């Protein structure tokens, strides 16, 4: 049993509109399993009887944190299997729907006379904080 996200930056992280995919294999043919991802039924469950894939798109109403799941199934005779609630390969996904915010603290130049003015060849330094860990930001000043 494996669970990953289609997040561009990290398959163990998810945000709103990312798809979470659970893939699993049964030891014998089973009827179409019932799968929940984040407490909500999977958008799709498909398979060939022993190899299965369940997918769900995360929404703004999902709970942040480690995404929990359940897999319930019956064999072809109708015997219920033991509910699965954990991966077998240590994969997992953390859902984050909080948009990071940036707060500007200061912009200063190395101008010898005034640190709030800059001329050609002066260097500018911008210091800011974010409300959570972020990737290295791309900073543009004056459209450059």
Regions found by a protein language model. Give the residues of each.
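Short strand-edge motifs at loop-to-beta-strand transitions and within beta-strands
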Residues: 50-56
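Short, solvent-exposed loop/turn segments at the edges of extracellular beta-sandwich modules
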Residues: 73-83
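Short proline/glycine-enriched turn/loop motifs at strand-loop junctions of beta-rich domains
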Residues: 26-32, 129-136
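A short beta-strand segment in extracellular, disulfide-stabilized domains
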Residues: 19-24, 123-128
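Surface-exposed, short loops/turns at beta-strand junctions within beta-sandwich domains
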Residues: 58-66
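Flexible, low-complexity linkers/stalks enriched in Thr/Pro that connect modular domains
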Residues: 1-2, 86-108
């Amino acid at each position: 049993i494996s669970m990953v996200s289609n997040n561009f930056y990290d398959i163990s992280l998810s945000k709103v509109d990312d798809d979470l995919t659970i893939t699993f294999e049964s030891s014998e043919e089973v009827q179409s399993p019932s799968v929940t991802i984040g407490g909500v039924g999977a958008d799709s469950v498909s398979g060939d009887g022993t190899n299965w894939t369940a997918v769900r798109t995360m929404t703004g109403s999902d709970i942040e944190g480690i995404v929990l799941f359940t897999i319930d199934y019956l064999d072809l005779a109708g015997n219920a299997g033991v509910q699965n609630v954990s991966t077998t390969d240590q994969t997992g996904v953390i859902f984050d729907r909080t948009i990071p915010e940036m707060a500007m603290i200061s912009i200063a130049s190395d101008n010898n006379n005034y640190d709030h003015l800059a001329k050609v060849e002066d260097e500018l330094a911008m210091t800011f904080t974010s409300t959570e860990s972020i990737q290295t930001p791309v900073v543009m000043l004056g459209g450059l």
